[in-house]
Amino acid sequence: MNIQALLSEKVSQAMIAAGAPADCEPQVRQSAKVQFGDYQANGMMAVAKKLGMAPRQLAEQVLTHLDLSGIASKVEIAGPGFINIFLEPAFLAEQVQQALASDRLGVSQPTRQTIVVDYSAPNVAKEMHVGHLRSTIIGDAAVRTLEFLGHHVIRANHVGDWGTQFGMLIAWLEKQQQENAGDMALADLEGFYRDAKKHYDEDEAFAERARNYVVKLQSGDTYFREMWRKLVDITMTQNQITYDRLNVTLTRDDVMGESLYNPMLPGIVADLKAKGLAVESEGATVVFLDEFKNKEGDPMGVIIQKKDGGYLYTTTDIACAKYRYETLHADRVLYYIDSRQHQHLMQAWTIVRKAGYVPDSVPLEHHMFGMMLGKDGKPFKTRAGGTVKLADLLDEALERARRLVAEKNPDMPADELEKLANAVGIGAVKYADLSKNRTTDYIFDWDNMLAFEGNTAPYMQYAYTRVLSVFRKADIDEQALASAPVIISEDREAQLAARLLQFEETLTVVAREGTPHVMCAYLYDVAGLFSGFYEHCPILSAENDAVRNSRLKLAQLTAKTLKLGLDTLGIETVERM
């Protein structure tokens, strides 16, 4: 149940009945403060201005047409014309019952769409580093949310598996194999790439061979394709270990690398020329875009084919968008790529729209994100100033969590401790990132992310186990509880119930905006409200069985909401801590 949508519809009908235009926006929002009710309709100002009347006068007229019987206990006008809506306790009780009766907690399913989500995108023959973390986990949280809502989601892992560097890498792999050290060299991808580059820079004969190999690979030579495939396979096998550790849903089947679009590139260049969008300029093929200006104020030239016949990332991204619409039949495409790529993507998509490859009705959305910074406010690095490998970061998270868990549970069996440390350590790294607005840079801080206070994974995981512990102590007859009514008579019961019933609204925002931090803030709020409810509304020592069972049901919905919400973020919950 989406209460916000229900109220929006009711207020909108009342506004139209009061003389507002049919497309009026009621602007129903969740209230920021308890004294303003559960929801506020803020749309009177804008509409009253169009109608040439005072907002408060319009609000009064709207109230005469607004029928919220059975939904709201009180509706009042505040300030210049805000309408405050206080939900009826009996309505809240009924919605809590319905949510508990459903596996989906009463969350409705929107019209099913095919949504392509482009995320992670590491490079072949390189180990994943911290720079890949944000795209991977934010993209995966979006995917989980969209799938839960019932959409057909296609994960697209746009790996960097093509380019001139592959001549160098194949030549180096060949050299290692001749020395019977091929597999050993590939076990350390980072070292393999570094050694290949060193030889390429220092040995002219090796560099010449590498350049010839690029040509052979690009012409489809079987031997070189096999060597290339070996590099891709070994890299993706290593990456899969990282994905599994991160509890990310990507698999090998989701790889749609740059090489996939190679066969399309000549046709796209020819088509853009035929449509008069691309022209020859200084030997290269260029699309001039009025929408982007260079330093002189002239239309910016975007190169799609170099003088030597080579293609660019832009050409691949044009082909990629076309493929996602024509072949994958996407209704919507989301790209989780860092903010530095924004202009590049906008230029590619401007060409895509002008060429008619993807209609305007299909959104192409750049869900960009900021950087991960160290405590010094500079990009996160190792002590020696190098790039932090993702595997090393996860090892450290596990080690720190292990110490933390062992400290709190000295007698816990080793296997249980390891499982708990994994959930806490990996959860802490992910949640610290997901709980920040993705558009901003954020400071990576071990102490903060592993704290048991504040908006952190350990706090949320602990909050969940705390709710479960109520049930362990209660010794409940599940069937008797299922048929027990929900009674809401205390303010703290009403506040917790109202917030729990905003789960669908929260999912809707995350799905629309691609902002998992909204879910984190919601769950943290729920945990805080439960804490206040637990303190002031005795559950197991309630005055009678009816109140006890009703409060147990509120606790039950809290546990289910926390678990399901954390699951949409890819954060594991545990039964005990």
Curated annotation (Swiss-Prot):
Major site of localization recorded for this protein: cytoplasm
SMART domains, A to Z: Arg_tRNA_synt_N, DALR_1
Record-linked InterPro entries: aa-tRNA-synth_I_CS, Arg-tRNA-ligase, Arg-tRNA-synth_N, Arg-tRNA-synth_N_sf, ArgRS_core, DALR_anticod-bd, Rossmann-like_a/b/a_fold, tRNAsynth_Ia_anticodon-bd
PROSITE patterns the UniProt entry points to: AA_TRNA_LIGASE_I (PS00178)
Catalysed reaction, written as an equation: tRNA(Arg) + L-arginine + ATP = L-arginyl-tRNA(Arg) + AMP + diphosphate
GO annotation (BP), single: arginyl-tRNA aminoacylation
CDD domains noted in UniProt: Anticodon_Ia_Arg, ArgRS_core
Cystine pairs: none
Localization of this protein: Cytoplasm
Entry's Gene Ontology cellular component terms: cytoplasm
Record GO terms (molecular function): arginine-tRNA ligase activity; ATP binding
Major enzyme class: ligase
E.C. designation(s): 6.1.1.19
'HIGH' region (motif): residue ranges: 122-132
Keywords: Aminoacyl-tRNA synthetase, ATP-binding, Cytoplasm, Ligase, Nucleotide-binding, Protein biosynthesis
Pfam families: Arg_tRNA_synt_N, DALR_1, tRNA-synt_1d
Subunit and partners: Monomer.
Similarity comment text for this entry: Belongs to the class-I aminoacyl-tRNA synthetase family.
Protein's name according to its UniProt entry: Arginine--tRNA ligase
Species of provenance: Salmonella newport (strain SL254)
